Amino acid sequence: MDHLPIFCQLRDRDCLIVGGGDVAERKARLLLEAGARLTVNALTFIPQFTVWANEGMLTLVKGPFDETLLDSCWLAIAATDDDTVNQRVSDAAESRRIFCNVVDAPKAASFIMPSIIDRSPLMVAVSSGGTSPVLARLLREKLESLLPQHLGQVARYAGQLRARVKKQFATMGERRRFWEKFFVNDRLAQSLANADEKAVNATTERLFSEPLDHRGEVVLVGAGPGDAGLLTLKGLQQIQQADIVVYDRLVSDDIMNLVRRDADRVFVGKRAGYHCVPQEEINQILLREAQKGKRVVRLKGGDPFIFGRGGEELETLCHAGIPFSVVPGITAASGCSAYSGIPLTHRDYAQSVRLVTGHLKTGGELDWENLAAEKQTLVFYMGLNQAATIQEKLIAFGMQADMPVALVENGTSVKQRVVHGVLTQLGELAQQVESPALIIVGRVVGLRDKLNWFSNY
């Protein structure tokens, strides 16, 4: 380990920055946020420094570097564009045993500045030891996406409860189990983010009153249409907190690779070599695992409330009194149309869009008369096997035979394939496509040649 990561308490302590440009301004902003009593020494200053000085936030000393300014300092930063001056600052700080950072010259510095993820009072620092600042920045950006913005509020509230937790729970094991339950409670986190004091208090009292081995919960998460980059941040957070993930075949391998490594995985989909797990059995798996006290994620392709049978699964949990929540996902209609260059609505061609299941209950019938109406876009889910029937019915109820159609196979993924034609060809086109696939019918399909972008990548 080349550097010891430490967090410095600088509130009301003297610090010095030498330099008055943009780089110095960025460093000054960090020190001011930390509450430092800041002096800035430079020949010239960008306007922001004058603003801060006029507001009494820092002191400006105009002129060449004055090393006596270091005499009362705890920490210094050299941020000029003159290497000679920066080295003088470093040497003067070293002689006084004051830690000094030299911007873009880690070998001349006694400390380096990390990339920071600020969820105060929770702080995360990332450093490459000065060898690769860009890598440190990329890691910081990834961590920023993983850590909820309200995490700091949760940490601050936890600090307020420490004495009560210590008093109520006698052993370290009990306290640990309580805090694990506390920090994964989405209702509490959301209530804190919304400043809903009544809900915060109610959830807190429930956490303290529940036995530590209480039943778990189920989170219904939409995985999106395929591209792992379309998984929501909240969805990513949930699958990385799960004890067990129950998933179907529409969830891509790229997304499953993001699941917490030691989480159990239960496949309940239908694909070659596997039998389809009946819906009732899936419901019982969710119920059984939650009753063991586990955090269960039910991971579904697309959005769980759009032809995902999510409502049926939650009804079972609701009846059993199991806590649950839902994280929406980008539905296949949105993802596949966007990645195919087909806008679902358009001022000239479609004022509405209909999402339709092509997989009906026995004896079921769609409202073909309204589906055949003009100025709308139809998106059929699970419609490949019924493509010929869809073609026949729409034409029979008055839709023009030359209406553009498109079938999107493996939408949003690197395997995406789009075939298109007109309505009279729909049944034939469906023979060229494999599931999972989506059928889009409407004049907007004609814009594909102009708006297609994904196939160019």
UniProtKB/Swiss-Prot annotation:
The active site is at D248 (proton acceptor), K270 (proton donor). The keyword ATP-binding does not apply. GO terms for biological process: cobalamin biosynthetic process; methylation; siroheme biosynthetic process. Residues 216-457 are annotated as: Uroporphyrinogen-III C-methyltransferase. Residues 1-204 are annotated as: Precorrin-2 dehydrogenase /sirohydrochlorin ferrochelatase. Pathway: Cofactor biosynthesis; adenosylcobalamin biosynthesis; precorrin-2 from uroporphyrinogen III: step 1/1; Cofactor biosynthesis; adenosylcobalamin biosynthesis; sirohydrochlorin from precorrin-2: step 1/1; Porphyrin-containing compound metabolism; siroheme biosynthesis; precorrin-2 from uroporphyrinogen III: step 1/1; Porphyrin-containing compound metabolism; siroheme biosynthesis; siroheme from sirohydrochlorin: step 1/1. Its EC number is 2.1.1.107, 1.3.1.76, 4.99.1.4. The keyword Transcription does not apply. S-adenosyl-L-methionine binds at P225, G301, G302, D303, I306, T331, A332, M382, G411. Pfam families: CysG_dimeriser, NAD_binding_7, Sirohm_synth_M, TP_methylase. NAD(+) binds at D22, V23, L43, T44. It comes from the Bacteria. CDD domains: SUMT. InterPro entries: 4pyrrol_Mease, 4pyrrol_Methylase_sf, 4pyrrole_Mease_sub1, 4pyrrole_Mease_sub2, CobA/CysG_C, NAD(P)-bd_dom_sf, Siro_Cobalamin_biosynth, Sirohaem_synt_dimer_dom_sf. GO terms for molecular function: NAD binding; precorrin-2 dehydrogenase activity; sirohydrochlorin ferrochelatase activity; uroporphyrin-III C-methyltransferase activity. Then it catalyzes the NAD-dependent ring dehydrogenation of precorrin-2 to yield sirohydrochlorin. Finally, it catalyzes the ferrochelation of sirohydrochlorin to yield siroheme. HAMAP family: Siroheme_synth. In the N-terminal section; belongs to the precorrin-2 dehydrogenase / sirohydrochlorin ferrochelatase family. This is Siroheme synthase. The lineage of its organism: Bacteria, Pseudomonadati, Pseudomonadota, Gammaproteobacteria, Enterobacterales. The gene is cysG.
